[in-house]
UniProtKB/Swiss-Prot annotation:
Lineage, highest ranks first: Bacteria, Bacillati, Cyanobacteriota, Cyanophyceae, Synechococcales
GO BP annotations listed: ATP synthesis coupled electron transport; electron transport coupled proton transport
Keyword Transmembrane helix: yes
Protein's job: NDH-1 shuttles electrons from NAD(P)H, via FMN and iron-sulfur (Fe-S) centers, to quinones in the respiratory chain. The immediate electron acceptor for the enzyme in this species is believed to be plastoquinone. Couples the redox reaction to proton translocation (for every two electrons transferred, four hydrogen ions are translocated across the cytoplasmic membrane), and thus conserves the redox energy in a proton gradient.
Gene behind the chain: ndhD
Location in the cell: Cellular thylakoid membrane
Protein name: NAD(P)H-quinone oxidoreductase chain 4
Keyword Lyase part of the UniProt annotation: no
EC number: 7.1.1.-
Membrane topology, record value: Multi-pass membrane protein
Length: 563
């Protein structure tokens, strides 16, 4: 008994010390810098011409980066806390107000994990690349660090730099390794994304210099500023354009089908799995969190734009005869649910938007990888030239079927849970009139109905029907190889796991989403007159009115100190 009484406090103290060390370890800086440093080491890797050593080196760097992000989640992140964790702050250029500030909360941590996971699989998907392999994997690894930085940095100028950092790798990956129209697609991508990102810089400067004095661009400082409603509306509109291009929002979407139409399979996976999520994340982080009064005014517009995305892109996808463009428009349609969830003043709806981003990242990456694998065998993307290959590629057909069912939100898959959460969250959101909710839900349901029609029709045209004699005689229709089965299996495990037990993912961000929604509900109360009749200007419950401000400056270290 005496031994137990003595050892228990020692164990508790050791555990607390271990937690403090884990929380203070620079996990996020390491996850950003490690792949970037690895990218700059790629040119020094011995290469016999086909890039075998480079492939293994890049895969090792990507896997270690994934392990670092998982370790950050397990040893430095507490899902029950809504505030900023894993925070690191180093003064960089104080005269310009620029600070190396990184951290993670429930809005960013799941996307950091998604980024490192998808990138590791994209490197494996790039195994057949033999043309300029050093440059290819250099760009992939640099893109990995830049995308993690987008989700991890806590300074708006740093965010802009990270946002721009990933543009050049994508441009080169499209322009050098793309299809016949790769130059057009790459140029269109850079014009849309680089041009729209100027709004981010202008808004960052306006918010950082607001009120005079020394500029400060950290999110913690910006969240405490009392920006006027008019100022917020201007900033919100500019950011909506910038992030709407990346999401993308119709009509700012036209770069995406062209980019997907010319990209290779690993670039597809990065575009669909990560790049589009940057737009959704930024809308949550900046528009909804830092500009709450403007968000309360713009929220109905987001919901309407979400419905337009769902219906327009679904109808357009239905009419596409090019396989890549069909899946690209399907991605745009699914991202419409993210807009509806963000536009709702419901914790369930916003949580559904977050889960939809994660779910679509996994499902979109799997579908586009299969598109690339199918093209490698058939050498065509035109559905009219396919057909009847199911007998020769049975495993490939099985993989396509499971991933297509996941995309059409089959129960038991992650897409079903996320879309259901958005629907139920918005339908029960009393910030909008019943009529508006019924109309929006009904229109969104049309897109849900169209999705299985065009996806199942696509499967029929690829694998069933009369066998194309010319296709069979001029191509090598071999079945899926072990590497391809492994990649899809890795993606299906979380897709099915989240579908069967959503709390595997939702518990990691619920606390942060609840605080975000409380902040927006308080802003809704401060608006004297609604921006549209769809918003009810009624008194919220006392629990909501008295809720605390968003504690994004609270770190895990502070929590441990209190304990």
């Amino acid at each position: 008994m005496l031994e137990f009484a003595i050892s228990a406090p020692l164990d508790t103290g050791a555990e607390l010390l271990s937690d403090q060390v884990s929380a203070n370890f620079p996990w996020l800086s390491l996850s950003i810098l490690f792949p970037i440093v690895g990218a700059f080491l790629v040119p020094f890797i011995p290469d016999e011409g086909e890039g075998k050593q480079v492939r293994w080196f890049a895969l090792g760097i990507a896997l270690v980066t994934f392990v670092i992000t998982v370790a950050a989640y397990l040893y430095g992140y507490d899902p029950s806390l809504s505030g900023l964790q894993l925070s690191e702050r180093v003064s960089w250029l104080p005269d310009l107000g620029l600070t190396w500030a990184v951290g993670a909360d429930g809005i960013s941590m799941p996307l950091i994990l998604l980024t490192s996971f998808i990138t590791a699989l994209a490197v494996l998907a790039a195994w057949p690349v033999t043309f300029k392999p050093k440059l290819f994997f250099f760009l992939i690894l640099a893109m990995d660090g830049g995308q993690i930085a987008v989700f991890a940095v806590q300074d708006m100028l740093l965010f802009f730099l990270a946002w721009e950092l990933e543009l050049l790798p994508v441009y080169l990956l499209l322009a050098i390794w793309g299809g016949k129209k790769r130059q057009y697609a790459a140029t269109k991508f850079i014009i849309y994304t680089a041009g729209s990102s100027l709004f981010i810089l202008l808004v960052a400067l306006a918010m950082g210099f607001f009120g005079g004095g020394t500029p400060n661009f950290e999110y913690t400082n910006l969240a405490q500023q009392s920006f006027g409603t008019g100022f917020q509306l201007l900033c919100y509109a500019g950011l909506l354009i910038a992030f709407g291009v990346k999401l993308p929002i119709v009509p700012l979407h036209t770069w995406l089908p062209d980019a997907h139409g010319e990209a290779t399979a690993p670039v597809h996976m990065l575009l669909a799995g990560i790049l589009l999520k940057m737009g959704g994340y930024a809308l949550m982080r900046f528009n909804a969190q830092l500009l709450p009064e403007a968000h309360a005014q713009f929220a109905p517009l987001l919901i309407v734009l979400g419905v337009v995305n769902i219906i327009y892109a679904a109808l357009t996808s239905f009419a596409q005869r090019n396989l890549k463009r069909k899946i690209a428009y399907s991605s745009i349609s699914h991202m419409g649910f993210v807009l509806i969830g963000i536009g709702s003043f419901s914790a369930l709806g916003t949580s559904g938007a977050m889960l939809q981003m994660i779910s679509h990242g996994l499902i979109g990456a799997s579908l586009f990888f299969l598109v690339g694998a199918t093209y490698d065998r058939t050498h065509t993307l035109q559905l009219d030239e396919m057909g009847g290959v199911g007998q020769k590629m049975r495993i490939m057909f099985a993989l396509w079927t499971v991933c297509a069912l996941a995309s059409l939100a089959l129960p038991g898959m992650s897409g079903f849970v996320s879309e259901l959460m958005v629907f139920v969250g918005f339908a029960t959101d009393e910030a909008y009139t019943l009529t508006f909710r019924i109309v929006i839900a009904g229109l969104a349901a049309i897109g849900v109905i169209l999705t299985p029609i065009y996806l199942l029709s696509m499967l029929r045209e690829i694998f069933f029907g009369k066998e194309n004699d010319q296709l069979v005689s001029h191509t090598n229709l071999v079945d899926a190889e072990p590497r391809e089965v492994y990649i899809i299996s890795c993606l299906l495990v979380p897709i099915i796991g989240i579908g069967l037990y959503p709390r595997l993912m939702t518990d990691s961000y619920t606390a942060s989403i609840q605080e975000l929604v409380k902040r927006d509900e308080l802003a809704l109360q401060r608006i004297k007159k609604p921006s549209a009749l769809m918003i009810r200007n009624t008194t919220m419950t006392p629990a909501v009115v008295s809720s605390p401000r968003l504690p994004i400056s609270q770190t895990r270290s502070e929590q441990l100190t209190r304990k």
